[in-house]
Amino acid sequence: MIFYLEENRIFVLETENTHYVFGIDSAGYNRHLHWGAKCDPADYAFTEIGDENSNHSMLDEYRQELTPFGSTVYRTCDLKAQFADGCREVALCYTGYRLKDDTLRVAFADAYYPLQVRLGYR
């Protein structure tokens, strides 16, 4: 079963014994929140990281569901692209979701280039 907590923009994938939880934070980043024993959905919240500096990137601390290459991400990325003008930075923005027949599709688009990404869950 999959359900969406609209007020917090959080998705919960539920099995008999577990929850897999991720969501879209206030800045539009996709963030992994929990995988494990079922919890009360009220317990799922985004942790804000505010002490960013040149040696410590908040994007490196965020456990993103999908980590695109670019910005201040210094760890291994899940998505890399090179656009026609040579740019290799991907700036994904959340554009919406579709939940139908217990299949979830979460959509993102690049802020500057014609790239669309959809994550699928069943």
Features from the language model and the residues they span:
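N-terminal accessory beta-strand-rich subdomains and adjacent acidic, glycine-rich linkers
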Residues: 1-122
